[in-house]
Amino acid sequence: MIRVATVADCVQNPPRNGVACGRGFTVEHMSKGEQMQEQKMPVVAVVLAAGFGTRFDENNPKQLVSVGGKPIVCWSIEAFENNDRISDIIVVVNERVEETVNELIDEAGYAKVRAIVPGGAERVDSTLAALDLLKQTGIPSGAKILIHDGVRPFVEERSIDGCIDSLDQFNAATVAYASTDTILLTEDLGDRKVVKSVPERPNTFRAQTPQAFRFGTIVKAYELAAADPDFHPTDDTRVVVDYLPDEPVAIVDGSETNLKITTPSDMPIAEGIARSLDPEHAKEEAKARMHAVFAEAFSQMHSR
């Protein structure tokens, strides 16, 4: 079993020869003069799965709910496990289900998962838990970090690759999907919301994940944010935008299917996406459509 890693573990047992807490990071605890193996910076995926909303099941969080015969969090982990460019994965979980997630990871044989980290009450606490662990491993500031919502099970490989590639030119990037709806910015007027402005639609996007950063950039942004008593970010990109305003954040194309499963009403859509990703199911659906076309054509021929 993967043991749950804590910052204390890493302080007491610093990484050696590329081995860190949990199963061991591929990053090295670099001293002066040392270099990364094969001169490559690590590319680390952080899967945030510490939320514990009970709208699905009072005993289990939604990331453990099955979609297409597989727990939601497993879909998310697999997206990075199957990407050859990802070197390491950290999974941040709620302590109440860490044993269950541990077992799921072991059963699936996810080889890139190096540690399971206890998350916090808020999303920001979970991100900070992962960043603190990475600091203790001695990960270089130039490492590429992709932070992903564990309840976005259908992130596409092209979006992951787009994040990794964008960090060659920028220090921050986020997957986002162009809005097809007109977006309204509002303000309060008495007890009502009223329209303040209407941004041009070509400039409006819906933020998704992963959100990607050079390690030094996201750490610096959070350090600056920590000094702000009004610090209440909704995602990691917001931290960079607010506290490193001169740091451009690149947009990486997302997709309609990269949905965040939030309520039970999202489940039918998620199940449909899961079915479409099953090659056998897709083949059967194509065959059924073909039969329907022939049946319709045959019916029309005999009705003349």
Mark where each language-model region is:
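Residue-level signal for inorganic ion chemistry
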Residues: 47, 73, 130, 149, ...
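Short aromatic-hydrophobic micro-motifs that form the base-stacking/packing surface
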Residues: 144-148
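Short phosphate-binding loop-to-helix
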Residues: 106-143, 237
